[in-house]
């Protein structure tokens, strides 16, 4: 403890002596991070030291945050820093650097607020506000958020709601900034109403003042239902009483409309304008309040908020209003909105803003119904590149990374294509063997376990068969996947079922020939269309050859003069002529009518 007493009196920077002080206290500790039992021992010592410092400050009559103040002579402003804040700074530095347990600083702050008076608590809380950024870091917040919440709640209980309004507001603002938006402890998960906030009003009529006291009691009795709207759905009599009282108030507002001049006179649009947080319920003010446009808006807005609660989404069936109650709610809501619209100043704009807020409120209600899931996103760390350092561009041997890896793999595996253990395309007989075994009735394999139900297996098998056995692949359309299996692999009992019959083979061959003939016909038709011009030229040559043959034929007188010695020559000439004639005729026939192929 003496080591820390001396440490808080030093003027040197905290980082130069904080860790050494801890290591000196826990001997022979030389590590930069304490163990669990060492943390507990250090925390107990610090709490004892803090208690002694607070007691000494109380005896001296000084404020605890200024007790044992240190004056920095080097600073012109005479920076005053007491021993207790200096001790808290040392512990906060150790927690931030993770030399000690992160929740230690929060425990010391809780002890300090409990030992301080309300006047000193303001100074302590001022120190907490100044260290809000450090205390809110994730490594510290996770360890001490519950302790800090308990500390602030204890302060709020000790403060007076009437005299310490500003200090209460500071605490609430700190909690709003310190905790995330999705913190469950601040959203009233169960929807509990503050029924202790009662609006008190006069029960007996005053003497000597002419006031419609029945209307006065009816008007302020509505606050009992606004304070606890859930009571309206528990009993139908309460809803009937509330609806009748509300109808009286709305009728009065209708009977006493406000003019634009009255609305402008009572407007709270000025920057310095204020209003009371509690209603003034004196019966003497009833007439003036009815002429106040802001007062009317407060009452009508309370009605809309309560109606919105009664119809809130996500409620249980037992908490929902009845059908009759829903109709009355609708009529009352329409009437309230109409009164808000005609209430000056700018009634339509005010009503539109209220409707927008109530619509957005449904998102909040659903979020609470879903258990308040967190919706904050951590900021992305922006890593700035080193200034002046340019990243070297990587070069690849073959243009890109994949090609270079493939080339290196080929160099590193020279026997990849000749290795006997390499992956090969299987033979269809080996591939279809498991399916053939499934088709054996004697094996007793159930259908749901057959390989034919494996779509990947069948797809691969069809690809292999299409490359190696086209005839077997053609059986797929008629017999299914089992027909693709080679016949020699099938068991004898089912082989006849999937074996192709001779007549079927003949039909298949004839069908293939027919397909081949049709292809030839199409080729001939294309050939005819391409050789029409050549046919015309061929016909002219044939006519020329025929005229030459007639000119060379001898007359009858010449045949008699030649006599029998030339018979053989004449016969040969006649045969030649006949052959030439037939040849010319065939040529004409071929050119005019090309022969049709015989199927």
From Swiss-Prot:
Residues 575-585 have a biased composition (Acidic residues). GO terms for cellular component: nucleus; THO complex. One of its GO terms (biological process) is defense response to fungus. Component of the THO complex, which is composed of THO1, THO2, THO3, THO5, THO6 and THO7. Disruption phenotype: Developmental defects as well as reduced levels of endogenous trans-acting small interfering RNA (ta-siRNA). Residues 502-522 have a biased composition (Basic and acidic residues). This is THO complex subunit 1. It comes from Arabidopsis thaliana. The gene is THO1.
């Amino acid at each position: 403890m003496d080591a820390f007493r001396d440490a808080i009196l030093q003027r040197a920077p905290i980082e130069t002596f904080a860790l050494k002080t801890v290591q000196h206290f826990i001997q022979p500790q030389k590590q930069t991070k304490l163990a669990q039992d060492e943390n507990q021992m250090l925390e107990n010592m610090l709490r004892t030291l803090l208690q002694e410092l607070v007691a000494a400050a109380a005896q001296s009559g000084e404020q605890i945050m200024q007790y044992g103040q240190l004056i920095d002579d080097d600073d012109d402003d005479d920076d005053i820093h007491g021993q207790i804040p200096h001790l808290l700074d040392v512990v906060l530095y150790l927690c931030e650097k993770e030399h000690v347990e992160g929740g230690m600083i929060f425990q010391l702050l809780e002890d300090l607020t409990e030992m301080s008076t309300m006047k000193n608590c303001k100074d302590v809380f001022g120190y907490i506000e100044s260290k809000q950024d450090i205390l809110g870091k994730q490594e510290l917040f996770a360890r001490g958020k519950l302790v800090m919440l308990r500390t602030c709640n204890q302060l709020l209980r000790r403060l007076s709601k009437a005299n310490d309004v500003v200090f209460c507001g500071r605490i609430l603002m700190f909690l709003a900034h310190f905790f995330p938006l999705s913190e469950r402890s601040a959203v009233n998960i169960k929807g509990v109403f503050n029924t202790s906030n009662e609006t008190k009003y006069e029960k007996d009529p005053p003497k000597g003042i002419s006031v419609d006291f029945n209307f006065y009691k009816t008007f302020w009795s509505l606050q009992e239902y606004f304070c606890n709207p859930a009571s309206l759905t528990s009993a139908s009599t309460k809803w009937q009483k509330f609806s009748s009282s509300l109808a009286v108030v709305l009728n009065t507002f209708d009977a006493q409309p406000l003019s634009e001049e009255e609305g402008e006179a009572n407007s709270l649009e000025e920057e310095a304008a204020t209003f009371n947080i509690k209603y003034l319920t004196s019966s003497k003010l009833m007439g003036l309040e009815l002429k106040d446009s802001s007062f009317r808006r407060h009452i009508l807005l309370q009605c809309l908020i309560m109606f919105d609660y009664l119809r809130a989404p996500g409620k249980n069936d037992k908490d929902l209003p009845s059908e009759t109650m829903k109709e009355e709610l609708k009529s009352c809501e329409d009437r309230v909105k109409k009164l808000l619209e005609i209430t000056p100043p700018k009634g339509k704009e005010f009503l539109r803003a209220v409707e927008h807020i109530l619509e957005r409120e449904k998102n909040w209600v659903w979020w609470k119904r879903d258990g308040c899931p967190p919706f904050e996103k951590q900021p992305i760390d922006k890593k700035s590149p080193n200034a002046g350092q340019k990243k070297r561009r990587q070069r690849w041997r073959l243009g890109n990374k994949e090609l270079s890896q493939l080339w290196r793999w080929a160099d590193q595996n020279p026997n990849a294509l000749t290795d006997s253990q390499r992956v090969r395309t299987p033979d269809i007989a080996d591939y279809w063997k498991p399916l053939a075994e499934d088709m054996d009735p004697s094996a007793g394999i159930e259908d749901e376990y057959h390989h034919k139900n494996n779509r990947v297996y069948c797809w691969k098998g069809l690809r292999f068969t299409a490359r190696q056995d086209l005839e077997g692949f053609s059986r797929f359309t008629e017999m299914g996947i089992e027909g693709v299996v080679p016949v020699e692999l099938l068991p004898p009992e089912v082989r006849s079922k999937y074996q192709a019959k001779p007549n079927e083979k003949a039909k298949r061959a004839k069908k293939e020939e027919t397909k081949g003939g049709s292809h030839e016909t199409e080729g001939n038709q294309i050939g005819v269309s391409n050789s029409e011009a050549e046919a015309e030229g061929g016909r002219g040559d044939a006519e020329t050859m025929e005229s030459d043959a007639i000119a060379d034929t001898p007359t009858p007188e010449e045949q008699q003069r030649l006599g029998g010695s030339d018979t053989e020559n004449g016969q040969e000439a006649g045969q030649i002529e006949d052959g030439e004639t037939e040849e010319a005729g065939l040529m004409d026939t071929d050119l005019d009518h090309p022969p049709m192929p015989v199927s």
